[in-house]
Each structure stands twice: as C-alpha cells, then as structure tokens.
Amino acid sequence: MRSTLGPKGLDKLLVDDEGRTLVTNDGVTVLETAKVEHPVAKMLISTSSTQDRVARDGTTTTVVLSAEMLRNAWQLVRQGVHPATIARGFALAEDFALSCLEDLAINATQKQVLSAIETSLAGKLDQAMEAHLSLLA
C-alpha cells in the first residue's frame, strides 16, 4: 500500500481468480480486490472503504496511518501497557491534532490547489479527463 501513496505513487497490477487484470494506484481498489481473512486486515479494508465513501480520496493515507498506529499500539501492549490506556492516548492525540489544525492551515495558491486536485484524481480517471476536471476547479 505504501508504494501507491502520493503523486509519485506506483501502480499495482491486480489479477483476479479468472486471470483478469487491472492496473491501479487507488488504495481502496487494491484493498477491496485483496482476499484477506485476518480480522485486522478486514478492519483496515472497512476503514479504507469508509474513507472512500466519505471523501473519495485519502484511502491509502488512512490505511498507512491506521496500520502504523496499530503497530505502535501492539508494541505498547507487548510492553505491558493496558489497551484502555492506549485508547485514551489516541483520544488525547486526536484532540490535540484537531486543536492545531487552524494554526497549521495555509492559504494555497491556485497552482497548489490545481496540483492537489490533479494528485487526488491521479489513477482514478483517464488522463485527459483528469486534466479537464482539474481545470474546472
């Protein structure tokens, strides 16, 4: 998943059971195509699907950040930290991050906005359609 992240993200070649192929760098597509059994993997796929449904973007970032948080939480559990303490820590971190957003916000130039739109559309549509839609913004 990490390798699909960002404007220089790499495409993935997906092959289903019937040999059909799909090339994509869309995180939710990669995940929803995967066959997984592990409950945590299923939870991450569900999180990605929710992100896609709500924002239509950010699925890979959501999964990469969530997976890293889970990895760190597991290390804390292995060190003897109670899961409830970890959950409280995540809640405090969320509150702190949300309180900082206003101070971190910047005014973007038209060029930066266009670049962000193009990045968001990359790999989701035909390239000509991506260029056309990004100019409409």
Residue ranges and their predicted role:
Residues 1-136:
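N-terminal glycine-/lysine-enriched basic segments
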